[in-house]
Amino acid sequence: MTAKALSMGKILLSGPSSNLGLRRWMSSMDRFNIDLIIIDGALSRMSLASPATSESMILATGAAYSANITNLVQKTAFVVDMINLDLTSEENRLRFNDIHTGVWAVDDNDEMHDLKVTSSLSTKINLDGIEHCKTLFMSGALTDGFMEHIRTKKVFKETEIVVTDFTKVFLTPILYKAFVRGGGKISVMMKSKLIAVTVNPTAPNGMVLDSDRLCKTMSEAINLPVYDLKKCD
């Protein structure tokens, strides 16, 4: 239901509990000639930022994420790196477009193999007939556990892992960087558009970080402008 307030007051907001429900609701707004829909997400609800749902995103971070500037910058920079993962080739996008379940490998002869993986938590992978995996497509989440399992196997040396979008990547920076250093690559079927990064230097416990230092350090780390919206008022 959509409503307009007749007077000042307090409201209790609720909304769709899934991305599918959210997309349906957004489509229903066409009849109201709505030009802009703003989705309120969180770092713990990254799926809302999927390019399948939103056209672009603003990354809001701050002292609530970490009260240490160095740690906060490192964590945020990694999130930005994931958002900016390269789009995979058009050939791969066409090849995997209609696959919605499982994990699939493409060998050096461009033949596809169903690895019979039912979950990203599984360590049982069917590698029969595969000498080297050129491309690995994951329809679900890419987790630390799965990455730990495959990166030690020669068949996955210098493999490109393709996921639907950045919200499907649940890797720690250490594992991600180790995979890339080994010649691996992670790319996406749908690329997100990051249009701004904002910070709130005030933590929930009242601790306040140096806003100027935070914005400057983070901007240098991610090579993007960073805004403290409170100072922009």
Show where each model-derived region lies.
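Flexible phosphate-sensing "switch/lid" loops adjacent to ATP/NTP-binding sites
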Residues: 1-233
